[in-house]
């Protein structure tokens, strides 16, 4: 033995060693083979088979080995393979002093015994944190390895049970360990009691040296011959104050079939020493007396990253394409977890340590960390890169680009084997308070590395691969597309000349197919889209690849994913053009936009080809003009509403026409489709090739990442924006900004109210329907929903409309401050926030009395009404007398925008409006909710604290008497019930009682301790009776129709104020014009009558043209049908055109009278209103159409009197300003609002006093009463003027208030607008004789000249001869043809001249004798579909006789006249 060897070991004399056992000594003495352990054993077995006979009994077959024998016999179970193995692994290159990843040939078992000693040294740092050094010496030449640490030494004392020193017990006896107590949680590497003993067993010499400072002793002992021989321990006095433990061993190379420690093994052993630099904190590591310069785990990791960079075949780009390729993301999470991340070179790498053990095969700890990082990376990238869609990438593909470094401490770790290469401990058993969590900080730092580019590249490649599966090609035939009508030339060499028509559904496809009969099937194909195309910009590749519509389009057109198309290679497609054929509405625009988005995103270049994308337009309106003469009818199509409106206001005034709206393609007939395709150039429009900012606008419209920019884009939208219908080539940016934006706005329009009336369109439609129906008596909500849906063009389902109606009628606390509809039934309560309403078929509603005080009917003619198909529906907005958006508040969520506006006290609003009128500064207002008794406290400029009410009523009882507004009773109850506790929580409420009526009252009992706790916390806070109210999101459509965010409530008031004031001026101007027109008309009628009476004007025996010329000669003013003076005769039909129009009207009058039988009316075909032009004759209808009873002196005087009255009204109106009119409305509103509040308070007090809600009274049927006996006719005496009309049969409800009725209440105002107004040129008044059952029709009269009294006269006149009327009515109803024969010779239009001739009293006005008696009652039994109604001219003088009442004819037939015998 060399001198160097004597430094490590004893002299080897026989006195120094004793055999550990006889059996092992003999065994080892006889086996001196230099073969590897495995080979030696196998050769022994094989030789025994050849030379030794087989055992003859079972005892010889079955053997028992000692533990030591078993380890030597089967080493792979304990230390791994003892054969040389080629493997790729990280090593330390001593020459370059760097890590390298290379293929080496090592014996894993030899590496493992060295590792066991290193782990023991590292474990001692856990036991003794004061340890400072670990020194490793590897003498390859002499085959000697030494590991020393200066931590606490091994106790040098005798083991009481085993009767040997503890160092000998630990290193020389198997299955000895300090780690067997599983109740004690340790984070060391030792586990099974083998460890260093394995190193001893596989060494020819093994020595331990340890210093125990406590005992003051130094202990030395050695083993030889594979731990078979052990020397006696040498114990001496410790001469230093330093403790240490040193292990020196000589590996038994023969057991590993090795002659020496080769370079491959040495490089792995050196790397393992470097591992300690990263895993053992605050400890100096020495290798062969050289201190290693790595002092942290991050520094250790950098060695690997540097090696990765050197291995990379491509240099790191300098242009930023791949960011921070060699960046290390390192983070220490706690004292047990330290993780570093780097980007790998395409395969997953990990270097991990569990309690300083190198887990080269990973394990549960590596999976635990990597899974978290991968999931968070994919999730975050999905949000950042592609919106909310999931990236098409597998976790393993992400893992392949990761290099993870993990240094962790696991309590009592478990491994797959004694080699400890792979951890198997469950995550739940890792121990420690805090485990590793991939937090946002770590993920965000990882996202700054090049892994983002790698993941994106992999995901894109996967997506492309998936999408390419559905690629099309130029085939002559496509299989599996049942709905495809393929062009005959598609897929051939002429395919690029073919056009594919994409239609909106199958119904539109029928229209296209009908058109193909004109252009042929060779170059035109057709395919229907089912619904709306997928937004591919935000969709995942998985969604796109599974979308049937997109796959069909790719196959039909022949599109290939990501192929860049040009004008040259477009011939590779089956179709060279796409024509979009959708409805001309917002949904149609959306479909066009989605197709553009699909092509721009998936097939770059297609939109750069001029003429590739086309659209087919159809008319929105068709006008049928009745041409005169032999020309017949003429049809004029209009493709935009502005175009139609211009024609209507110009050329349309000169002719008779009807209009038909084409809402969708399905409205057109196959014949019309052929007409469209015949004039294909007129109906085709091209989309301009991409230019300028087109791509940016497409991205703006469809990308979720552009949400903020889209919000600003929508905010800049101006109502009335539309594409120019004259352009033949549509720029895509214009399409997005002027057509597609209408669809984008539609959701906001439905969800966000107007600042002017506070309504959304659905609410506005309901109110319009109620006004149109004159809803003064209750109706079922279900019926009202049906009526509104039918009459206002509502297209979203009646159930949604039902909820809107219920919302307008709800009046519980927190709902509406003013409910414009009455809640007659269960409309929901505060308990559930109104969601607990009854079914619509069980509840009733009607207009509240206050509603028309808010929405004055005098404003109705001033609104701009929406056109929906042939219907005129609700106005664009109403103008209430005060801003209802602040009265009832508003909530809604739209696209990119939402709103939340609180409610305010109407009286405060009125005060501020009047302050604005007076030029005073506005006062700040506090939100107010009717009936709510809580507290509101400011918490800043735009926030309020909302508090309920709670009081302590005894030592352990509290009473809740109010809850925060918008917090519902059931929510509070649920919270209180949770206070009773459950299996997981302790109770803190003893008992709870409810005593609610219309108010809130909870009585809650607590324990003494909980009461004290509640008082410390605060009763409001403990019982969650505090919320907040924000003013920071008050969004509404401003008066210009643009979305606007209001900064404060006063800004809303100002926006409302100026528009409302402007419309009061418009109301005054409108009323002034009407009064002036009425004055002029009355004056002209009086002059006409006077000239007839004084025989200055003769109308007898003159033709129409002569009469008109005569009137023009006397400068009589011409009036239109709506009562407005006609300034120029150029606006009228004259000459032959006028004669032909008059003849047409007379003929239609005859047809109408002859076709009034119910049997002749065709069901399902509503009469279409035709526009009838004004003629020179109709302009004098107000004179020549007067009934002959008007030509009396009494009537002349009455008209003069009425003229004076109207003049007085006009002067009174002119004396008032717009503000005066507004103040008058506000006074009336406040008076009604006080009544409204009083009724509400009385109802609540009544319900509270009864302790429960009263049952709803049943709606009484109209039954006979004392004043109105059943089944009896009521005869009204002619001279009595108790009412202006017969009492109608009405349903009555019990009420403390007198019921208003048209028959009993006097007019509150002069009906100024009832005279020839444009919106209602004549107002209908319906009167009905009393009695429950009557066969008489309702008598319809048209109010003119404030004729309340004369209506009564006419009714009395009819009533006085009711018997004759009924008989005549019955006969006319039974025999309409016979009655027609009794008509005068001019049944179409009766002039004064004709009437005088019929009555044979021409020139005699003193004693008129009618030719036959006709009554209004008789005339009403026969339906006449005429446009003009008879007009009653009467006087307001109550002392006039009814004989003076005269009915002015409309000139349509004789039935208009009412005379007395």
From Swiss-Prot:
Q: What is its main location?
A: nucleus
* Residues the record lists as binding Mg(2+) 2: 583, 585
Q: Where is the active site?
A: 842 (o-(5'-phospho-dna)-tyrosine intermediate)
For this protein, the record's SMART domains field holds: HATPase_c (SM00387), TOP2c (SM00433), TOP4c (SM00434)
Compartments it resides in: Nucleus
Q: Which SUPFAM superfamilies match?
A: ATPase domain of HSP90 chaperone/DNA topoisomerase II/histidine kinase, Ribosomal protein S5 domain 2-like, Type II DNA topoisomerase
Indicate yes or no for the key word Disulfide bond.
Answer: no
The cross-references to Pfam families, in alphabetical order and at most eight, read: DNA_gyraseB, DNA_topoisoIV, HATPase_c, Toprim, TOPRIM_C
Keyword tags: ATP-binding, DNA-binding, Isomerase, Magnesium, Metal-binding, Nucleotide-binding, Nucleus, Phosphoprotein, Topoisomerase
Give the GO molecular function terms: ATP binding; DNA binding; DNA topoisomerase type II (double strand cut, ATP-hydrolyzing) activity; identical protein binding; metal ion binding
- Describe its function: Control of topological states of DNA by transient breakage and subsequent rejoining of DNA strands. Topoisomerase II makes double-strand breaks.
The molecule here is called: DNA topoisomerase 2
Its gene?
A: TOP2
